[in-house]
C-alpha cells in the first residue's frame, strides 16, 4: 500500500520556505521557486548536486538481506520499540524520522511494531540516492528523501521520535525537528561490537579496538535528560550471512584481503552486537 504524503511537512532546505507539490512531479518552494524532483518511486531528492558516499547499491542490498532475512538486528529493534512503546502524542498516530536511514530496513522494522494501538508514520532521509531508491521501492508505505541532515527539509517540530542508528548526528537540527516532549534515540557501537571481525581482520592495528566515549559525551552534552541503555547479544551467521556482513561493514573495506578471504571461507561464525542505545528527551 502506498501512503499519501503530507507535503506540508516539508520546507525548502535552501531558503526555509514552505513547499507546494507541482503536478506530482516536483516540489517547489513558495518564496523563491527552488524546485526538487519527486521520483516516480515516491521519494524526493532535496540535494542540489550529487554527493559522493562510500555507500552504494551492493552495500544496501547486503544490509537489507542481513537485517530482513537473518534478523541480525532484531533484538535491537525490539529494544528500541520498547523504549518508544508509549509515545506521548495524543493522536492515533505518531511520527518517526530515521536520520541516515540507508535502505530503510531499520525504519521499516520499527514501524511494524504495535505501539499501544498507535500507528507509527515513518520518514527516512539519507545522503545516498542508492539507499533511498532501494527504500522507496521496497517500503512504499513510508516516506523517503535524499537529503542532508545538516539542512533537513522539514518544518520545525514535525516528529515525535528522531532516530540516528550508526549514523552521524546534527543535534541542532534534531532539536529543531522534535516536537515538545519528543524523544531522540541514537545507537552507537560499544567496544565489543563486531569484536570477532576486528580481532580476526586486524592482527596489529588500532582498529582492533574501539571506544564510543567521545560519541556518548557529545550526545550527553546535546540531549536533555539523557540516559544510556546497553544491549549485547551474539548472532550465529551462516556463510552467506558472513558475506553480507563483510559487504555491509566498513571494517572489512580496508582490511587485508587475505584475512577477508579467510573469513569468507568460514561456514559459520558467532558475531557480537554490542551497542549503547542513547535516549534523550526534548
UniProtKB/Swiss-Prot annotation:
Residues bound to S-adenosyl-L-methionine: 103-104
Residue ranges of the TM segments: none
Enzyme class: transferase
Superkingdom, taxonomy of origin: Bacteria
Residues where Zn(2+) binds: 12, 15, 29, 34
Record-linked Pfam families: Methyltransf_25, Zn_ribbon_RlmA
Annotated SUPFAM superfamilies: S-adenosyl-L-methionine-dependent methyltransferases
Enzyme Commission number(s) from the entry: 2.1.1.-
Entry keyword set: Metal-binding, Methyltransferase, S-adenosyl-L-methionine, Transferase, Zinc
InterPro entries assigned to the protein according to its UniProt record, in alphabetical order: 23S_rRNA_MeTrnsfrase_RlmA, Methyltransf_25, RlmA_N, rRNA_m1G-MeTrfase_A_prd, SAM-dependent_MTases_sf
GO biological process: methylation
GO MF annotation, one: metal ion binding
Homology family: Belongs to the methyltransferase superfamily. RlmA family.
PANTHER family linked to this entry: METHYLTRANSFERASE, METHYLTRANSFERASE TYPE 11 DOMAIN-CONTAINING PROTEIN
Protein name: Putative 23S rRNA (guanine-N(1)-)-methyltransferase YxjB
Amino acid at each position: 500500500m502506498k501512503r499519501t504524503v503530507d507535503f506540508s511537512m516539508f520546507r525548502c532546505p535552501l531558503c526555509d520556505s514552505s513547499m507546494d507539490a507541482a503536478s506530482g512531479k516536483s516540489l517547489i518552494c513558495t518564496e523563491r521557486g527552488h524546485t526538487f524532483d519527486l521520483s516516480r518511486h515516491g521519494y524526493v531528492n532535496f540535494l542540489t548536486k550529487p554527493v559522493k558516499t562510500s555507500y552504494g547499491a551492493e552495500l544496501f542490498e547486503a544490509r537489507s538481506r542481513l537485517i530482513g532475512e537473518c534478523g541480525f538486528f532484531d533484538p535491537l529493534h525490539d529494544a528500541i520499540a520498547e523504549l518508544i512503546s508509549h509515545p506521548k502524542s495524543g493522536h492515533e498516530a505518531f511520527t518517526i524520522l530515521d536520520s541516515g536511514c540507508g535502505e530503510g530496513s531499520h525504519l521499516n522494522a520499527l514501524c511494524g511494531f504495535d505501539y499501544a494501538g498507535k500507528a507509527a508514520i515513518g520518514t527516512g532521509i539519507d545522503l545516498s540516492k542508492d539507499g533511498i531508491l532501494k527504500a522507496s521501492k521496497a517500503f512504499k508505505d513510508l516516506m523517503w528523501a535524499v537529503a542532508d541532515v545538516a539542512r533537513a527539509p522539514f518544518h520545525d517540530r514535525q516528529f515525535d521520535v528522531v532516530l540516528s542508528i550508526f549514523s552521524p548526528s546534527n543535534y541542532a537540527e534534531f532539536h529543531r525537528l522534535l516536537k515538545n516532549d519528543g524523544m531522540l534515540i541514537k545507537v552507537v557501537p560499544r567496544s565489543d561490537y563486531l569484536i570477532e571481525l576486528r580481532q580476526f581482520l586486524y592482527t596489529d592495528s588500532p582498529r582492533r579496538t574501539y571506544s564510543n566515549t567521545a560519541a556518548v559525551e557529545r550526545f550527553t552534552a546535546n540531549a536533555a535528560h539523557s540516559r544510556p541503555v546497553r544491549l549485547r547479544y551474539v548472532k550465529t551467521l551462516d556463510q552467506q550471512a558472513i558475506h553480507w556482513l563483510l559487504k555491509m561493514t566498513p571494517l572489512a573495506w580496508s582490511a587485508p584481503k587475505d584475512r577477508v578471504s579467510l573469513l569468507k571461507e568460514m561456514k559459520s561464525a558467532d558475531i557480537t552486537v554490542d551497542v549503547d542505545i542513547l535516549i534523550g528527551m526534548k
